Amino acid sequence: MINYLKSFFLYEIVRGMALTLKYFFKPKVTINYPYEKSPVSPRFKGEHALRRYENGEERCIACKLCEAICPAQAIVIEADEREDGSRRTTRYDIDMTKCIYCGLCQAACPVDAIVEGPNFEFASLTHTALIYDKERLLQNGDRWEQALASKLHKDYEYR
């Protein structure tokens, strides 16, 4: 009988309208995305980049720790030895469609060569555009170097 009276007086509709009025006058939390962007944490893991030293030499020493630790097996590295005995990468590919953005590659790197930068807008229409080669990763590093250095400095106390 009580259920019948509640439905007769449209109790559910009144409760729904009360809830609507409750939130109607609160400030909006929606962000108009292409024109407004929400703040990004300094520990955000975005698009990958390879960094260089100040003299322009790439940091990667071809230790392959990032390739070994990657749980998604998204990183492929090939290396050659130089005349001075040091190793440098000849091929450094990351398949961004396999990457799970866990940050283990960045944590494993002893020289901070591979980092996950602040960029999150790298959508593509083709699969091949999401397979990053060494040149693209170095371009990302050059483009985002100031932000990457700032991010690593802020994150230093947690390492």
UniProtKB/Swiss-Prot annotation:
Instruction: Name any cofactors this protein relies on.
Output: [4Fe-4S] cluster
Q: Which residues bind [4Fe-4S] cluster 1?
A: 60, 63, 66, 109
Q: Which PROSITE patterns match?
A: 4FE4S_FER_1 (PS00198), 4FE4S_FER_2 (PS51379)
Q: List the disulfide bonds.
A: none
Query: SUPFAM superfamilies from the entry?
Result: 4Fe-4S ferredoxins
**GO CC term (a single one):** plasma membrane
Subcellular localization, as worded in the UniProt entry: Cell inner membrane
Q: Which GO terms describe its molecular function?
A: 4 iron, 4 sulfur cluster binding; iron ion binding; NADH:ubiquinone reductase (non-electrogenic) activity; quinone binding
Query: According to the UniProt entry, what is the EC number of this protein?
Result: 7.1.1.-
Q: Which Pfam families match?
A: Fer4_7
- UniProt protein name: NADH-quinone oxidoreductase subunit I
How is this protein positioned relative to the membrane? Peripheral membrane protein
> Which positions does UniProt annotate for [4Fe-4S] cluster 2 binding?
70, 99, 102, 105
Q: Which UniProt keywords apply?
A: 4Fe-4S, Cell inner membrane, Cell membrane, Iron, Iron-sulfur, Membrane, Metal-binding, NAD, Quinone, Repeat, Translocase, Ubiquinone
* Reactions catalysed: a quinone + NADH + 5 H(+)(in) = a quinol + NAD(+) + 4 H(+)(out)
Give the encoding gene's name: nuoI
Q: What's noted on cofactor binding?
A: Binds 2 [4Fe-4S] clusters per subunit.
Where is the 4Fe-4S ferredoxin-type domain positioned along the sequence?
51-80, 90-119
Which species expresses this protein natively?
Rickettsia massiliae (strain Mtu5)
Output the GO biological process annotations, alphabetical, semicolon-separated.
aerobic respiration
Q: Which HAMAP family match?
A: NDH1_NuoI (MF_01351)
Main function: NDH-1 shuttles electrons from NADH, via FMN and iron-sulfur (Fe-S) centers, to quinones in the respiratory chain. The immediate electron acceptor for the enzyme in this species is believed to be ubiquinone. Couples the redox reaction to proton translocation (for every two electrons transferred, four hydrogen ions are translocated across the cytoplasmic membrane), and thus conserves the redox energy in a proton gradient.
Looking up Gene3D superfamilies in the UniProt record yields:
3.30.70.3270
Subunit (UniProt): NDH-1 is composed of 14 different subunits. Subunits NuoA, H, J, K, L, M, N constitute the membrane sector of the complex.
The protein's matches in PANTHER family, at most eight in alphabetical order, are given as:
NADH DEHYDROGENASE [UBIQUINONE] IRON-SULFUR PROTEIN 8, MITOCHONDRIAL, NADH DEHYDROGENASE UBIQUINONE IRON-SULFUR PROTEIN 8, MITOCHONDRIAL
Q: Does the keyword Membrane apply?
A: yes
Return the similarity comment: Belongs to the complex I 23 kDa subunit family.
